[in-house]
C-alpha cells in the first residue's frame, strides 16, 4: 500500500523538477510575461499613449485637408478646375506656388482688392459655365465640335466672356481711381463750417438737436422753393404752420441741403455773390418775403398760392443739387 504512494510522490516530484527546469530554461519569457501581467498601470499608459498619438495624427490630417480645401477655393486656377476633375494635393500646392509667384511678379496689384477679386471670380464662373455648356452639347445633345449650332453658340459665349472681362478691367480701373480720390464723397460727411453757416443765416451750434430745431425758422425760407415740390399742400398756411412731422422733415431737408451745398462748394469752387453760395441775394430776399407774406395772409390767399404753385412744373430737389 505504501509503494503506490511512494510512486505517486516520486512522479509528482519528477513533475515538479521538470517544471522548475522549464522555468529555468525559459526564464526570460517567464519574467517578461510576469512583468506584463503583473503591471496593469504600465499597460494602461501604453494604450493611452497610443490613443493620444492616433488622435493627434487625425487632427493633423484634418488640418492639412482643411488647408488644402481652402487653397483650392482661394486660388483662381484651382477653383476653375475643381468642377471638372478632382485635384490632387500636389496639384493644389503647385497651383498655389504658381499663384504666389505671379503675385510676387506683378506686385500683388488688384488681387487684394475686394472689387477686383469679385470680378475675377465672376469671369472664372462664366468660363466654367461655358465649359459646362460645351460638355452638355457634346454628351447629352450629341453635337460634335463641327456642328454649326454648337460652333455658333460657343463662339457667342466666348465673345461675351471676352467682353465681360474687358468691361471688368475698365470697371476696376475706374474703381481704383475713385478709391484714390475719396474726398468727393467725404465732403458731404464733414461738419458744416461756422463761417458758411453765418453767411447763409443758419445756426452755428454744434449740437444736432439745436441745429434741427432752429433750422426750419431760418433755413426753411431759403429752400421753400425747392421743398414746395416735396410737400403736399395743406389747408392752413404753407411754411410755419405745418404739423410737427413736417417740421422735422423740413429741418432734415434744410440740413441735407446745407450739407449738399457745402459739398458742391468744396468740390466746385465757383465765385458766387455774398450770402448763400447757390442763390443770389435777390432770390433769397424774395423767398424770405414770400414766406413771411404767406404766413400772414388769409386762407383764400393760401389757396391761390397753392394753386399757383401746383401749376408750376415738377422740379425735384435732386435736379437742383445735381445741376451744380
From Swiss-Prot:
Species assigned in the record: Danio rerio (Zebrafish)
Family: Belongs to the HEY family.
Domain bHLH: 48-103
Gene from which this protein is expressed: hey2
GO BP terms in the entry: artery development; artery morphogenesis; blood vessel development; blood vessel morphogenesis; cardiac muscle cell proliferation; circulatory system development; dorsal aorta morphogenesis; heart development
Top-level division of the source organism's lineage: Eukaryota
Listed GO MF terms: protein dimerization activity; RNA polymerase II cis-regulatory region sequence-specific DNA binding
Motif (YRPW motif): 314-317
Cited PROSITE patterns: BHLH, ORANGE
Induction of expression: By activation of the Notch signaling pathway.
Residues of the Orange domain: 122-157
Function, in words: Transcriptional repressor. Downstream effector of Notch signaling which regulates cell fate choice in angioblasts. Represses the venous cell fate, thereby promoting the arterial cell fate and aorta formation.
Low complexity composition bias: residue spans: 294-311
Keywords, alphabetical: Developmental protein, DNA-binding, Notch signaling pathway, Nucleus, Repressor, Transcription, Transcription regulation
Single GO cellular component term: nucleus
Pfam families: Hairy_orange, HLH
Protein name per Swiss-Prot or TrEMBL: Hairy/enhancer-of-split related with YRPW motif protein 2
SUPFAM superfamilies in UniProt: HLH, helix-loop-helix DNA-binding domain, Orange domain-like
Subcellular location: Nucleus
CDD domains: bHLH-O_HEY2 (cd18920)
Region of interest (Disordered), ranges: 1-34, 294-324
Bias type Polar residues, positions: 22-34
Amino acid at each position: 500500500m505504501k509503494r503506490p504512494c511512494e510512486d505517486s510522490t516520486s512522479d509528482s516530484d519528477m513533475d515538479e523538477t521538470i517544471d522548475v527546469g522549464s522555468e529555468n530554461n525559459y526564464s526570460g519569457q517567464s519574467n517578461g510575461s510576469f512583468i506584463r501581467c503583473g503591471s496593469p498601470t504600465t499597460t494602461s499608459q501604453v494604450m493611452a499613449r497610443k490613443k493620444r498619438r492616433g488622435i493627434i495624427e487625425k487632427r493633423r490630417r484634418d488640418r492639412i485637408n482643411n488647408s488644402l480645401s481652402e487653397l483650392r477655393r482661394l486660388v483662381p486656377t484651382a477653383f476653375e478646375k475643381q468642377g471638372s476633375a478632382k485635384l490632387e494635393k500636389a496639384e493644389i500646392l503647385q497651383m498655389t506656388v504658381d499663384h504666389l509667384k505671379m503675385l510676387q511678379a506683378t506686385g500683388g496689384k488688384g488681387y487684394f482688392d475686394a472689387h477686383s477679386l469679385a470680378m475675377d471670380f465672376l469671369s472664372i464662373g462664366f468660363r466654367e459655365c461655358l465649359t459646362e455648356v460645351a460638355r452638355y452639347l457634346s454628351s447629352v445633345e450629341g453635337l460634335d465640335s463641327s456642328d454649326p449650332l454648337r460652333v455658333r453658340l460657343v463662339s457667342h459665349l466666348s465673345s461675351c466672356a471676352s467682353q465681360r472681362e474687358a468691361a471688368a478691367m475698365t470697371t476696376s480701373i475706374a474703381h481704383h481711381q475713385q478709391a484714390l480720390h475719396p474726398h468727393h464723397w467725404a465732403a458731404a460727411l464733414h461738419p458744416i463750417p461756422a463761417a458758411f453757416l453765418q453767411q447763409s443765416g443758419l445756426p452755428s451750434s454744434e449740437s444736432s438737436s439745436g441745429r434741427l430745431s432752429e433750422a426750419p425758422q431760418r433755413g426753411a425760407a431759403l429752400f421753400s422753393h425747392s421743398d414746395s415740390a416735396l410737400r403736399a399742400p395743406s389747408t392752413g398756411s404753407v411754411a410755419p404752420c405745418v404739423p410737427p412731422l413736417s417740421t422735422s422733415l423740413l429741418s432734415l431737408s434744410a440740413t441735407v441741403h446745407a450739407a449738399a451745398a457745402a459739398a458742391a462748394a468744396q468740390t466746385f469752387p465757383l465765385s458766387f455773390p455774398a450770402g448763400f453760395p447757390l442763390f443770389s441775394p435777390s432770390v433769397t430776399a424774395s423767398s424770405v418775403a414770400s414766406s413771411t407774406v404767406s404766413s400772414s395772409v388769409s386762407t383764400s390767399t393760401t389757396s391761390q398760392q397753392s394753386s399757383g404753385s401746383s401749376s408750376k412744373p415738377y422740379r425735384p430737389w435732386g435736379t437742383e443739387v445735381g445741376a451744380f
